[in-house]
A protein has these predicted regions:
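Acidic donor-binding segment of Leloir-type glycosyltransferases
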Residues: 20-69
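Short, conserved alpha-helix that lines the donor NDP-sugar binding/gating region
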Residues: 53, 57, 76-88
């Protein structure tokens, strides 16, 4: 089975190297669209200013699997369409990956076998979304949401939309056998390790974007980064509990829009790549945290 991975990224160097490494061996190709969308263009940001490009260009791509395009786009759908245009025609499935998602070889093999058995149109994941470090994940609606990541590839198909990822063929969305993350978890035990709320810098920039994005504009907690994320990260257990009780969790969306999202202790095992680099990642985390002292 030939799986092509697709990544969109801007200033995502915190876990990008580990993310690429975790999927490289299983990849038919890794297609990356690096650059900015309209919001960042309006702020004068047109490309990554951290080590994102360095990580991609210096990754030991011995099998020439990595295909990179840099540019600016209207929105994330257009950015995804850019990497999708690089997908080889003999691909069986495309797997959308965030720059802070890590997949283990064992889980990838389970997923590949599952794809062979079920032949789904799309496949979602239940997410272990880490918050403010490596010990706790976001529960509630975040935990129950199905993050659609894998899409069946048909020759001649095009990328329709980013939210949630959907392909189309002959002007019609490719739909049918769509399997959710909860079903995948029930059948295989597979979840998605997602470092989406670890890096202070990336959380700060994510919230700046989300506060203007169509999907979340007007629905975010005011001063979320300072009053929720930073206060939680720097707080004691009592302080953290008070913050979560006030906002019914820690997700940036106002609780009335999506429901509760209290944190939970992570009970799983970190991927070997994360354990190997944990000391380095904690040092990066602490260094970034010092940049946001109010």
């Amino acid at each position: 089975m030939k799986i092509t991975y697709g990544i969109i990224v801007l200033n995502g160097d915190f876990l990008l190297r580990q993310a690429i490494e975790s999927i490289y061996d299983s990849a038919h190709a890794i297609c990356i669209a690096e650059g900015s969308v309209s919001y960042w263009n309006s702020q004068g940001v047109t490309k990554s200013t951290d080590d994102t490009l360095k990580i991609i260009k210096e990754f030991p791509d011995k099998e020439n699997k990595i295909k990179l395009i840099s540019g600016t786009w209207k929105e994330k759908t257009e950015q995804c369409q850019a990497w999708f245009n690089l997908v080889p025609n003999d691909t069986d499935y495309v797997w959308c990956v965030d720059s802070d998602e890590i997949h283990t070889p064992e889980n990838i093999e389970k997923v590949k076998q599952y794809l062979k058995e079920k032949n789904p149109t799309s496949l979602g994941f239940k997410s272990d979304s880490f918050y403010g470090g490596f010990d706790r994940i976001i529960g509630g609606f975040e935990r129950e949401h199905s993050f659609k990541r894998i899409l069946k590839y048909e020759k001649g198909c095009t990328y329709l939309t980013h939210r949630q990822p959907t392909l189309e063929l002959n002007g019609k969305p490719i739909q049918g056998n769509d399997i959710t993350g909860n079903q995948l978890f029930k059948d295989t035990g597979v979840t998605m390790w997602h470092g989406s709320y670890i890096s202070p810098k990336q959380v700060y920039e994510k919230i700046q974007y989300y506060e203007t994005a169509v999907i979340s504009k007007g629905n975010c907690i005011p001063n979320y980064f300072k009053d929720v994320y930073l206060e939680w990260v720097n707080g004691c257990d009592t302080k953290r509990m008070a913050i979560e009780n006030k906002w019914k969790g820690v997700q940036e969306f106002m609780p009335h829009t999506r429901g509760a999202s209290f944190t939970e202790k992570y009970k799983g095992k970190h991927p070997e790549i994360i354990m190997r680099d944990m000391s380095e990642l904690i040092t990066k985390f602490d260094s970034q945290l010092q940049e946001y002292v109010y």
